[in-house]
A protein has these predicted regions:
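Transmembrane helix boundary and interhelical loop/hinge segments in multi-pass membrane proteins
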Residues: 84, 96, 161-175, 184-186
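Generic hydrophobic transmembrane alpha-helix motif, especially the helices
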Residues: 109-151
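Transmembrane alpha-helices
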Residues: 161-162, 184-216
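Glycine/proline-centered hinge or cleavage motifs at structural transition points of membrane proteins
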Residues: 115, 180-181, 194
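N-terminal, non-cleaved signal-anchor transmembrane helix
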Residues: 1-71, 75
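Transmembrane alpha-helix signature in integral membrane proteins
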Residues: 63-91, 204
Length: 216
């Protein structure tokens, strides 16, 4: 065995164990820190409670409004982002050359890497005033503004996953469909998109999870 192979076979298990130990330590730390609250209030009271006053003389830790608001905003952001993401994926698959498609996907991946804090700041500086002005509201800090900013954040995930899946199925069926005289657009609508349904659902779940993580 070469020295490099020996080094790799020795370092990989150590790194894997280190990551696992870090994860276990994080879970234990959170459990230890949360234990006083779990003793003070039951799980039912925490999940169904409507008040959040952790610093009061008699602390109240109700999460129902926080959970419901997170679900609502995340679902609304998915409603905005999913049709646009699928449409963009179809356009990238059928409407542009492979070189332009690769450039667009690289740009989208770069957008996905923008930190959430920066996206939130831009949303606060741009989206909130725009919503306030457009709908003549007293304030633009609303569920609509939050969902639109979240939709921008999760859109790259949807586009990337859907494009990869759609392109895979398109290459698989396109030649046969053209041989049968079926147009590319009809092939996309009748064959490719139904075949990629599972991947589209998976990308939706991942995007929804990302949105929930940001809102919580």
């Amino acid at each position: 065995m070469h020295l490099s192979d020996r080094f790799t076979s020795g370092i990989v298990p150590i790194m894997a164990v280190s990551v696992l130990a870090l994860y276990i330590g994080l879970v234990l730390y959170m459990a230890i820190e949360a234990w006083p609250a779990l003793i003070y209030m039951s799980w039912t009271d925490i999940v169904t409670g409507t008040e959040w006053k952790p610093m009061a003389q008699s602390p109240v830790l109700g999460l129902s409004y926080i959970i419901s608001a997170s679900l609502y905003v995340s679902l609304l952001s998915l409603i905005w982002a999913l049709p646009l993401g699928i449409g963009t994926s179809v356009g990238l698959s059928l409407g542009v050359s492979p070189r332009i498609r690769q450039f667009c996907l690289s740009t989208i991946d770069m957008i996905a890497g923008i930190p959430s804090v920066i996206v939130g700041f831009i949303g606060l500086a741009v989206m909130v005033p725009a919503v306030q002005s457009m709908f003549s509201l007293s304030t633009g800090e609303s569920i609509l503004s939050a969902s639109l900013v979240l939709a921008f954040m999760i859109l790259p995930y949807i586009v990337t996953h859907c494009t990869e899946s759609i392109e895979t199925y398109r290459q698989r069926y396109e030649e046969t469909a053209l041989g049968l005289g079926i147009s590319p657009w009809h092939t996309m609508k009748a064959i490719v998109l139904p075949s990629a349904k599972g991947s589209i659902i998976l990308s939706s779940v991942l995007a929804f999870s990302r949105a929930m993580g940001e809102t919580m």
